[in-house]
Amino acid sequence: MSTRIAFLKGHGTENDFVIVPDPENALDLPPAAVAALCDRRAGLGGDGLLHVVRSAAHPEARGMAAEAEWFMDYRNGDGSVAEMCGNGVRVFARYLQHAGHVTEGDLAVATRGGVKTVHIAKNGDVTVGMGRALLPAGDVEVSVGEREWPARNVNMGNPHAVAFVADLDHAGDLYAPPSHAPAGAYPDGVNVEFVVDRGPRHVAMRVHERGSGETRSCGTGACAVAVATARRDGLDPAATGTPATYTVDVPGGTLVITERPDGEIEMTGPAVIVAEGEFDSAWLEGVLA
């Protein structure tokens, strides 16, 4: 006997997600089910899926339950598990507000990348404490077709390779993941950002997200880009004691990234719930059969 399962759709700077509320972690969502739900032609469509679970009900999050009531069980569009999604956290927080679980102000969200602090502003913007960036040593190159560029290795809880280019079109169609060297630099894959300057402390980027392809926005990617650009510009807030703020344009909008002197990075941008409904469990079972 089939049942109806609630879902919502939301986006943060057009990085869009299927949202599945499941407070008690009762649903079985294997990778194939997530991929089917995120399919833009045969499913609901999304760059990824936000599985909304109480931290105490999820084995990966129970250790964070004292700090954060809710766990963002994030999945990429192909069904693979991801450590963190910056735009996803903002949309996750907006959903919690939409559902009446939280109000404007501060809250904590558990993720595989740790507990993230979130602030929901009166104007609708959501600010997320993204943690600190790690800058692993070692030279990395990325390439598309015959073009190749040196890249800055930045880790935001997930790996990023940031390449500065003369023209964003040089990245091509980004249907396939850009190549990287050395081949063993990212054993679990990497998110690749291509960046151009737009003005003082203002850049634009395109991104190929591992497991999802090119997306309209990537929050952790925008943070990685801001940090890489600051270092290229000779700015290190830990050394100067002055925050470094960059405006980062993505195809789906604009994010504002601030790196504080203590190393913490804050990302501010919009988050929107656009629809809600139900899907039939029998459909999903048929897809998985």
UniProtKB/Swiss-Prot annotation:
Catalyzes the stereoinversion of LL-2,6-diaminopimelate (L,L-DAP) to meso-diaminopimelate (meso-DAP), a precursor of L-lysine and an essential component of the bacterial peptidoglycan. Homodimer. Its EC number is 5.1.1.7. The record marks H160, E209 as: Could be important to modulate the pK values of the two catalytic cysteine residues. One of its GO terms (cellular component) is cytosol. It comes from the Bacteria. SUPFAM superfamilies: Diaminopimelate epimerase-like. Belongs to the diaminopimelate epimerase family. This is Diaminopimelate epimerase. Keywords: Amino-acid biosynthesis, Cytoplasm, Isomerase, Lysine biosynthesis. Pathway: Amino-acid biosynthesis; L-lysine biosynthesis via DAP pathway; DL-2,6-diaminopimelate from LL-2,6-diaminopimelate: step 1/1. The active site is at C85 (proton donor), C218 (proton acceptor). One of its GO terms (biological process) is lysine biosynthetic process via diaminopimelate. Substrate binds at N15, N76, G86, N87, N158, N191, E209, R210, G219, T220. It is found in: Cytoplasm. One of its GO terms (molecular function) is diaminopimelate epimerase activity. It catalyses: (2S,6S)-2,6-diaminopimelate = meso-2,6-diaminopimelate. It is an enzyme of class 5 (isomerase). Its main location: cytoplasm.
